[in-house]
């Protein structure tokens, strides 16, 4: 079967669609209200059909969003500010691990597609991401970094993440370092396909 290295499958219906498309394993990088975790557990228990799901129960970043705070209220003091500092990021990583995470997702750069964010701008620092990598490694897990921007991607690679997700503005120097370290690159090309010319360059 196919492996979808970057997906957002949060329901049995979505899981079934993926399976019918030939996907037998998918990494679900980010969850909303534990829906992906629940779907994963239903599949593993044999209650519903679907691919094997490897789930990150959240997306650790300075402004993780309302859903994160509702699932992890212990970080509520940051709801009007930012989740910052290596120890706080390590704590957030432990919280995701306690939810039976298969992988940890961190934000190395801001999100794309929103008027309020600049995807080229770095988010978590190298030290903060290294704290997540260290905590994940204690449980035999790895970290995937959402990284559009050049600086954020470079920070994430130096921090020791296993994979760079998106990598829109990643430069040759960082790609060379990724090759040296064995860091995987997941370019998520399907994200861009709806924005392209469906006819291609016919000339």
Question: Which residue ranges define each predicted feature?
Answer:
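Short catalytic-loop micro-motif centered on adjacent basic/acidic residues
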Residues: 3-5, 25-29, 142-144, 162-165
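Short beta->alpha connector loops
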Residues: 7-10, 30-34, 148-150, 166-171
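Divalent-metal coordination cores built from histidine and acidic residues
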Residues: 15-141, 174-201
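Structural recognition of alpha->loop->beta junctions
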Residues: 100, 154-174
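Aromatic-lined carbohydrate-recognition surfaces of secreted/lumenal glycan-active proteins
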Residues: 140, 146-149, 153
